[in-house]
Structures are given as C-alpha cells and as structure tokens.
C-alpha cells in the first residue's frame, strides 16, 4: 500500500527525532540530513517541519505532559518509543484538527515500523491514557458512541 504524504512525514520525523535523542545534533543539522533521505520528496514538508522543530523546541513541555501516563521514567524507554510518543503528544496538543484516534493509530504504526516487537502495544496504552487527559471531550464522545 502506498504511504500518504502525512505518514511519510511522520516516519521522517521519527527518524530525525531518534537521531536527535541519541546525538543531540541541532534541529538544523537533522533537517538538512532529512532533506536527503529516501522519501523526503513524497513527504508533507509543512507537517514534517512542524513536528520535527515543534518537538525539539517544546521537548521539556511535551515530556511533562507525557510523563504522568508512563509507567517508568521516560529515559528508560527506547529512543524509538520516546520519539513516537513525543510526536503523538505534539500532535495531540498542537494539531487538534487531527482526530485523536488517527494520532494514536499513526503512532502505533510508527512503533511497529521502527520499534521492538511489542513496543507498539506500550505506545497504544500510553497514548490512550494521554488522549483521555489532553482531549477529554473528544475521547468521551467517542466512548459514549
């Protein structure tokens, strides 16, 4: 199945944030490398820029929002899980136009693509709790049918 431009953007953002978490390179350096990455030409560049630079800029705030939904310190998560959860937290807080179920599904798919064998289950559970806190009206409406 062909990937959407938005999915491609999220995949590239995951790769960039993974690199940032491990190397602490500047967002400009990571951005420059991503521009040469396979699939960049098919990505939604505005979304990629918003996610990559937004997560790096607001890292501390996103970690604060995410931490209460975790069952362990964030630094004990794999870099892939951290990157995916930070992207989803950013989208839940800044891209209200994207339904929370889409944000969670995209994060689960990213975790399946890049993470360990069961990492996607953890990502799903964390984001389900987080979405209920960050978007209570939307999640409640969904649960009430």
From Swiss-Prot:
One Pfam family this sequence matches: NusB
The keyword Transferase belongs to this UniProt entry's keyword annotation: no
GO terms under biological process: DNA-templated transcription termination; transcription antitermination
Superkingdom of this protein's organism: Bacteria
MF GO annotations: RNA binding
Alphabetic keyword roster: RNA-binding, Transcription, Transcription antitermination, Transcription regulation
Gene3D superfamilies documented for this protein: NusB-like (1.10.940.10)
A Gene Ontology term for the protein's cellular component: cytosol
HAMAP family: NusB
Family classification: Belongs to the NusB family.
Physiological role: Involved in transcription antitermination. Required for transcription of ribosomal RNA (rRNA) genes. Binds specifically to the boxA antiterminator sequence of the ribosomal RNA (rrn) operons.
Protein name: Transcription antitermination protein NusB
Record gene name: nusB
């Amino acid at each position: 199945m062909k990937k959407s431009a938005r999915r491609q953007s999220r995949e590239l953002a995951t790769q960039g944030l993974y690199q940032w978490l491990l190397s602490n390179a500047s967002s400009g350096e990571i951005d420059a490398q991503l521009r040469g990455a396979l699939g960049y030409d098919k990505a939604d560049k505005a979304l990629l820029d918003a996610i990559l630079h937004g997560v790096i800029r607001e890292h501390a705030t996103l970690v604060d929002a995410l931490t209460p939904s975790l069952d362990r310190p964030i630094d004990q998560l794999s870099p892939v899980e951290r990157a995916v959860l930070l992207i989803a937290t950013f989208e839940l807080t800044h891209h209200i136009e994207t339904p929370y179920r889409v944000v969670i599904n995209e994060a689960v798919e990213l975790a399946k693509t890049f993470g360990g064998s069961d990492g996607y289950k953890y990502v799903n559970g964390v984001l389900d709790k987080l979405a209920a806190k960050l978007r209570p009206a939307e999640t409640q409406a969904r649960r009430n049918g």
